[in-house]
Amino acid sequence: MSRAPDTHSDFIPRHIGPSDEDQATMLVAIGAASLDALIDEVVPPRIRSRAPLALPAARSETDVLQDLKRIAARNQIYRNYIGQGYYGTHTPNVVLRNVLENPAWYTAYTPYQPEISQGRLEALLNYQTMVADLTGLDISNASLLDEGTAAAEAMTLARRGSRSSSPVFFVSQHCHPQTLEVVRTRAEGLGIELVIGDESRGLPECFGVLLQYPHSLGGVADYRELAQAAHAQGAVVACVTDLLALALIEPPGQWGADIAVGSAQRFGVPFGFGGPHAGFMACRDAYKRNMPGRLVGVSKDAQGNPALRLALQTREQHIRREKATSNICTAQVLLAVMAGLYAVWHGPRGVRRIAERVQSLTGALRAALAGLGVKVANDTWFDTLSLETGAATPAILAAADCARINLRQVDGARLAVSLDETVTLADLQALVNVFAAGLGKDEVALAPPQASLDGIPAAVRRQGPILSHPVFSSVQSETDMLRYLRKLADKDLALDRTMIPLGSCTMKLNATAEMIPITWPEFALIHPFAPASQTPGYRELIEGLSAQLCEITGYDGISLQPNSGAQGEYAGLLAIRAYHQANGQPQRNVCLIPASAHGTNPASAQLAGMDVVVVASDANGNVDLADLRARIAQVGERLAALMITYPSTHGVFEEAVTEICDAVHEAGGQVYLDGANMNAMVGVAQPGKFGSDVSHLNLHKTFCIPHGGGGPGVGPVAVRAHLAPYLPGVLDARGRLDPEAKVGPVSAAPYGSAGILPIPYVYIALMGAEGLRRATEVAILNANYIATRLRGHYPVLYAGRNGRVAHECILDVRPLKETSGISAEDIAKRLMDYGFHAPTMSFPVAGTLMVEPTESEGLAELERFIEAMIAIRAEIAQVESGERDRDDNVLRNAPHTAQMLLAEEWHHDYPRQQAAYPVASLRENKYWPPVARVDNAYGDRNLVCACLPVEAYA
């Protein structure tokens, strides 16, 4: 048996890969006297923090989890009928255990290397097929951040696709209030004129329309004529919809919607106090090249077999930068996978049965309430009833509180109730009893629900089947499902199998102890709009984590609301804009961005209403100070901000960072420091104290939230005191913004993806101040060890003082293209044959590989990677010497599948053994890529973004 963790902290050496002895060996190899001496050589003295962080000492796993149990127990789990876009759901246990709690799924990276990502790509294709099927539209993306931001993205997509020259976007007053607020925030930054009103009274001249279908308060409208009227004036029609309702009501694509958005939360993903949940978007084919987010498409591999990949990547922010259609990067892949698997598990009959049950229970409730004399305002319904309760409203709410039931309070005289799949007949009777008590009437027995669609007008009832692809009817038993999930997981490479040395991505350990609390009911089953009196545990968690992150970064205030790093950037830039406007300087709308910046930086600046001016990099990859000063002079009084990444995307600590900050401040601008590389600074430097005004953090990098195959993420925005009033506004329990708020919300839930905040909270508690600093030091040690060991085989493109790198290094493989024809992509694909995920390709410099090992990888794994890279260099040398063919070699043909190697005939210029087992250790533990190299061009020329017919895989 494995021993339980001791009462003292033994977590730090479990998180940090190299042992003390290994660290000593590595320090000798790189020529550093000690870890402290190494940090002195790497980090500029002007920004080096000497004092330890004011954080508690490290604690044991047992102690931390017990303390978190105490915090969680402060939350009160009520039976929720609030609805408003968030609904109770049953997560299939087979999905809970084998996906959400399985590191093969949650530790994977975004599937930019498709050959080793076929499992989650297939799961995402299921999700896309499900969304397109239920919405009746041509194409769906692979998830957005939440329903509110998906609606905001629909607005910007409508503006790009509309034939109208109007600046007006019309939003129905029947949308959820939090959606209205998020859309309003986005519209203000982009200069879009928002008109909110009742669509039944006609439309103004506008470029787009946003409807809610069904309405927030329950009505199910026939929008066919409205869509025709909108199209007649050149407007694009978007609607926010509900996937479960679409099992029974007419798909938006059939009545004329061009875009459908919403949340897949009720397909098996708990409340989590607001997230994470997968937002979705589907649209007509005409808009596909402007659609935000990632898109899984079908292509073929080098052997002609079907293979999946991310399609149309040239439209993404990391390529188009300030011309991007969106700043969406990390989305909600893990949650989208769960939602798609929910549909596979239940199948078309099961999903429809759930929808029919919810609708019939709602009808039974309506009849019972009418019998009590409650006026139901909506004559049509799926799952929600709007109730005019008048003067009895406070008494009903008090009775509900006594029964531990949450109702939605619309205003002082109206309530609403929303049902979901978790509601039982006993629950419904208790709900009716609450209304009877509040009205001072005798309890009435609930009549048996009738299998009827009376609440849905005949004109908008869905005709025809749902989820018609065979994949949704392929699972008959849990045995089937278990094996299907195992088959998918076995196709992929994640951190549970290998190091993922992606530069700028920080693929570190996501410890089991950190993950355990996210499924606790006290965290998972809390509605985001539950009364504050029911969420003191969450508020203690949020306040504690906020204080810790401020201490770590040196900032004065923070918002945990942004649910991705890109949203954190956006929120920080909105704060800067609002600050300048409050100071009477609205003309400050230019953002300076170095040429090497992350692609999200210019995309976020554009969304915040800023003009982007690019600053050159010098020969060493640093910000060119002369060009920076020239750009500052060029834009003059229009300067709003400079965005820099630190340490730089070139993997070095720029010596002149304080000088850069001073130059911007002297010109009246603010400094935005991208915190994507914070893993190199925790405990050794605090950006809030060396000149930066605002940063976002990636809790899914530095603070151990797993990447989930492309989300979830959390991107808190931290600021100095003068920007604190301009952090994202927090919505109240009704989903409305305080009129005094200076900036609107950037996420639909008040605290974003609060359900995964226990992960960084536990990480910080387990590591303590000393452990966090040591993690940074070892991350830098590991990167310098790799750079030192590989420098004789591949040039390291950039280095700082003393020839050191920060937490990552760039290997320059560009010369090999000329000498051998081998590219960075060829090396990346060949690494798959060695059992590795590739480093980051062609960023920030085209044709290079950027390696970030993180502190969690031990010396043995580093040596395995180094061995692979050296062996690959020897294989390239064989091509250079003419020993191997320039076009037919192990690199150009990589990766090699078992199918390729077991073919009866072998016509290649190298032996099968070299292809399969280039190093001896692979004979013990070999990963086999399920497909050969994927043909990217074919996939974009022949775009298919839904599941193929089964016979295609024969």
Swiss-Prot record:
The keyword Thylakoid does not apply. One of its GO terms (molecular function) is glycine binding. Its cofactor is pyridoxal 5'-phosphate. Its EC number is 1.4.4.2. Pfam families: GcvP2_C, GDC-P. It catalyses: N(6)-[(R)-lipoyl]-L-lysyl-[glycine-cleavage complex H protein] + glycine + H(+) = N(6)-[(R)-S(8)-aminomethyldihydrolipoyl]-L-lysyl-[glycine-cleavage complex H protein] + CO2. The keyword Cell membrane does not apply. InterPro entries: GcvP, GDC-P_C, GDC-P_N, GDC_P, PyrdxlP-dep_Trfase, PyrdxlP-dep_Trfase_major, PyrdxlP-dep_Trfase_small. One of its GO terms (biological process) is glycine decarboxylation via glycine cleavage system. Keywords: Oxidoreductase, Pyridoxal phosphate. The glycine cleavage system catalyzes the degradation of glycine. The P protein binds the alpha-amino group of glycine through its pyridoxal phosphate cofactor; CO(2) is released and the remaining methylamine moiety is then transferred to the lipoamide cofactor of the H protein. Belongs to the GcvP family. This is Glycine dehydrogenase (decarboxylating). It comes from Bordetella pertussis (strain Tohama I / ATCC BAA-589 / NCTC 13251).
